[in-house]
């Protein structure tokens, strides 16, 4: 535990300045990355499929290929980038994302949270058209991913940038997902299976650029 706390402090110290606590939850800011100095704070499942590059004068970190060398033991997303040295139970995560290629109904990005190990974690699949395996909050618990929601709200992907927010309260069990509208969640659920764990971004099998990641939590 002391090692995790030390690594978290190192991760925070490498990005400055840090803003105040989240105004809604009073959680402290524990991580921030605009990728201007690289991507050393991220652990990815397949380094060959992630690229740090400049887009319109701005540095981003993104997925460059739909195919991936990572083959999860339980059916779940292939493209995963986890923040190094930071674990939280309760958190607010925000970031900007751009979908690079229109792949149809399951065009997506994913957010991973309360990640215990490669076979136990939550994630949200922000798929364009919801069904049982797209556009839902999922759980992977030593078995293929399973939807915890029955969301019917589509995700309006386009060629531009979008803002995503994930809010987790582990004591209440609540999970809320926001897309562009930061006041009204596009989907939500309650579950207490997993507590403190890692946080990440990525996709099931699509190409995305990510920027301006901020994580408040404890």
What are these model-predicted stretches?
Residues 69-139:
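Secretory/extracellular carbohydrate-interaction modules
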Residues 142-163:
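Short, aromatic/His-centered strand-loop micro-motif at the edge of beta-sheets
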Residues 187-212:
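Flexible glycan-contacting loops in extracellular carbohydrate-active proteins
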Residues 22-47:
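Extracellular carbohydrate-recognition regions
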Residues 79-86, 150-156, 200:
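Beta-strand-rich interaction surfaces with strong enrichment in secreted/lumenal proteins
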């Amino acid at each position: 535990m002391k090692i995790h706390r030390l690594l978290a402090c190192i991760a925070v110290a490498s990005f400055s300045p840090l803003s105040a606590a989240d105004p809604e939850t009073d959680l402290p800011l524990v991580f921030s990355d605009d990728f201007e100095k690289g991507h050393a704070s991220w652990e990815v499942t397949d380094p060959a499929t992630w690229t740090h590059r400049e887009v319109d004068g701005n540095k981003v970190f993104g997925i460059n290929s739909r195919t991936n060398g990572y083959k999860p033991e339980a059916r779940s997303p292939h493209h995963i980038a986890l923040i190094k040295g930071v674990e939280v139970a309760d958190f607010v995560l925000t970031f900007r994302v751009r979908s690079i290629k229109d792949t149809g109904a399951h065009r997506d990005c994913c957010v991973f949270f309360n990640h215990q190990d490669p076979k136990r974690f939550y994630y949200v699949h922000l798929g364009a058209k919801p069904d049982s395996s797209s556009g839902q909050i999922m759980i992977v618990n030593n078995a293929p991913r399973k939807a915890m929601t029955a969301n019917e709200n589509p995700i309006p992907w386009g060629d531009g940038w979008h803002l995503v927010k994930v809010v987790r309260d582990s004591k209440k069990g609540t999970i809320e997902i926001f897309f562009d509208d930061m006041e009204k969640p596009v989907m939500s659920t309650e579950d207490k299976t997993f507590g403190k764990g890692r946080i990440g971004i990525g996709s099931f099998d699509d190409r995305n650029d990510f920027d301006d990641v901020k994580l408040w939590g404890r």
